[in-house]
Amino acid sequence: MSNQLIYTGKAKDIYSTEDENVIKSVYKDQATMLNGARKETIKGKGVLNNQISSLIFEKLNAAGVATHFIKRISDTEQLNKKVTIIPLEVVLRNVTAGSFSKRFGVEEGLDLKTPIVEFYYKNDDLDDPFINDEHVKFLDIANDEQIAYIKEETRRINELLKDWFEQIGLRLIDFKLEFGFDKDGKIILADEFSPDNCRLWDAEGHHMDKDVFRRDLGSLTDVYEVVLEKLQGLK
């Protein structure tokens, strides 16, 4: 049946469509942190995230990156290819910040000589623990070839994103991606790309991402609107 709720997430709900290989993602006006321990309704956030993510995924598709994105169909809705999500949060870091700085006792804002790719096991009960390649294989999440592909694709996506954000005066600090298997068993980029799952700093070092909510730095939607406007001007 179409339009049946399949999954309720922190930032969006997923519904079935008439096509068994296509889902509808509906973005919500909700901001969370600490794995959902703190929740807040922020009017307009869903519209902004849907617009930003749609724009980024359109550009990734055009650049030859295989993604689940099909098209945006309303202010808060988009159609996506149905995938089986790989239970990994794939984090790429260009600059020290957040949990990385805390874990290794280093200040924020240091450029990393080489971008670092990290894996976190997607499991709310375990608070998404930091894991390595051997853990990924032990948990039967992915094999060596799949791990290598995910890392390679993440680095390729990073180079594209860094260039786009540099063009609009924003520094891409780090970001989180999720991948999934499509109906043919191919690994493709899934989920979303918005200031919810990346860190962006402007030329003055101001946070242009969800850290505004995490650190109570001001209006989240005001910041997201600036990011959207900048992206809309990207050539």
UniProtKB/Swiss-Prot annotation:
Q: What organism is this sequence from?
A: Streptococcus thermophilus (strain ATCC BAA-250 / LMG 18311)
Domain of life where this protein originates: Bacteria
Q: What is its EC number?
A: 6.3.2.6
Q: Under the GO molecular function aspect, what terms does this record hold?
A: ATP binding; phosphoribosylaminoimidazolesuccinocarboxamide synthase activity
Keyword ATP-binding assigned: yes
User: Which CDD domains does the record match to this protein?
Assistant: SAICAR_synt_PurC (cd01415)
| Protein family (similarity comment) | Belongs to the SAICAR synthetase family.
Annotated keywords: ATP-binding, Ligase, Nucleotide-binding, Purine biosynthesis
Known catalytic reactions: 5-amino-1-(5-phospho-D-ribosyl)imidazole-4-carboxylate + L-aspartate + ATP = (2S)-2-[5-amino-1-(5-phospho-beta-D-ribosyl)imidazole-4-carboxamido]succinate + ADP + phosphate + 2 H(+)
**Pathway(s):** Purine metabolism; IMP biosynthesis via de novo pathway; 5-amino-1-(5-phospho-D-ribosyl)imidazole-4-carboxamide from 5-amino-1-(5-phospho-D-ribosyl)imidazole-4-carboxylate: step 1/2
Question: What biological-process GO terms show up in the record?
Answer: 'de novo' IMP biosynthetic process; cobalamin biosynthetic process
UniProt protein name: Phosphoribosylaminoimidazole-succinocarboxamide synthase
Under the heading Gene3D superfamilies, the entry gives: ATP-grasp fold, B domain (3.30.470.20), Phosphorylase Kinase, domain 1 (3.30.200.20)
